[in-house]
Amino acid sequence: MSTLTPREIVAELNKFVVGQEQAKRMVAVAVRNRWRRQHLPSDLRDEVSPKNIIMMGPTGVGKTEIARRLARLSGAPFIKVEATKFTEVGYVGRDVESMVRDLMEIGINLVRDEENARVRKAAEAAAESRLMDLLLPNSFGQEERASTREKLLQQFRLGFLDEREVEMEVTEQGGGGVDIFAIPGMEQMGGQVKDMFSKAFPPKHSRRKMKIRDAFNVLVQEESGKLVDQDALSQRAKERVEQTGIIFIDEIDKIASSSQNRTSDISREGVQRDLLPIVEGSSVNTKYGMIRTDHILFIAAGAFHFSKPSDMIPELQGRFPLRVELQALGREEFLRILTEPDNALTKQYEALLGTEQIRLSFTMDGLEEIAAFAEDINSRTENIGARRLYTIMEKILADISFDAPDMPGAQIVVNKDYVVEHLQDVRGDQDLTQYIL
């Protein structure tokens, strides 16, 4: 679990998300409270539940990005789901429990990656040994074999044998070649049927020719599987999900009916009632066992243009005690987004075109013009926040991106005149629908 303080968490989030200080502080405290809870006496620890959060704000202001970066910082299993994809029990569609099952799968993969990294050196050593056995026939004498083996090993480590082919036995998963296509809303049943076939049909072994570098990767995976205790892995993942998991429920406002339409939206209220036991704490059956949701952190988000949090059923409102409103982005924020974050769009395009030996640079007046244009379009059409910058940048750099392979060594400076020239055909055009993502 992350030991970062709230101030350190906010500082890390500032590297990727511009503004929205109140939201950053709120989620930072939520993560720190998890660390604090782990240091409580066991009898009190179970009584402390996470304070779930509702983020309110228009699209493209950083709601999802804050939650995603927060999960990476804390090393927590994280999943984003859309509330509109779920249906009330009894209707065709995904049931709300599927998000917990999906979160558990993410937790399994997260812990498996950590375990594979932990045993990587031992797995590579075992894989090298098996690879040398494949390359050296048994006809060699003991001393000659040892000497040749050492030389081959050095050549392999230097990459001299990567393109050479070797024939080896590959283990294929059981299942009899049967692919299971799950019916929407019945994914768990599809997984159970697939597991049943996997157990009924033992793994198959086949000989296959492949390049040595590919064979080495296959052998490393096999050896890692032998070194990692799968039962312990599942137990660790279960604990990680139950204690640190984060579920981000987007578009929560779409299932909150306004008072005028409440009578015609029975199914929306049904989804809310199905969500209620998951959010307040219950047990969900997965193929890895029962998962308790009591201490999973739920972060809900929505624009709330046509509804408000008070339109949700009272029981669900009470399970999201913390609420924060994210502000719409303007020219100043767009300029900061283009310059400040570690993954700023300008840095991404400079790196992308740098692979074609093109030196791309942006002047401050050029960036200011881009920011002003983004604000203008957002005010005249749908406000999609920072996502507007993606469309504008693609429009500005479309010709360069297309011609890049034919102009290696070129130096391109994107200044105000360059931006105006490439956007002049749409600046006065009232039909800007092509710029709405």
Curated annotation (Swiss-Prot):
InterPro entries: AAA+_ATPase (IPR003593), ATP-dep_Clp_protease_ClpX (IPR050052), ATPase_AAA_core (IPR003959), Clp_ATPase_C (IPR019489), HslU (IPR004491), P-loop_NTPase (IPR027417)
Biological processes annotated in GO: protein unfolding; proteolysis involved in protein catabolic process
Alphabetic keyword roster: ATP-binding, Chaperone, Cytoplasm, Nucleotide-binding, Stress response
Positions of ATP binding: V18, G60, V61, G62, K63, T64, E65, D250, E315, R387
Chief location of this protein within or outside the cell: cytoplasm
SUPFAM superfamilies, per database record: P-loop containing nucleoside triphosphate hydrolases (SSF52540)
Pfam families: AAA, AAA_2
SMART domains (alphabetical): AAA, ClpB_D2-small
GO cellular component: HslUV protease complex
Gene Ontology MF terms in the entry: ATP binding; ATP hydrolysis activity; peptidase activity; proteasome-activating activity
Protein's cellular compartments: Cytoplasm
Family statement: Belongs to the ClpX chaperone family. HslU subfamily.
Physiological role: ATPase subunit of a proteasome-like degradation complex; this subunit has chaperone activity. The binding of ATP and its subsequent hydrolysis by HslU are essential for unfolding of protein substrates subsequently hydrolyzed by HslV. HslU recognizes the N-terminal part of its protein substrates and unfolds these before they are guided to HslV for hydrolysis.
Assembly notes: A double ring-shaped homohexamer of HslV is capped on each side by a ring-shaped HslU homohexamer. The assembly of the HslU/HslV complex is dependent on binding of ATP.
Name used for this protein in its record: ATP-dependent protease ATPase subunit HslU
Gene: hslU
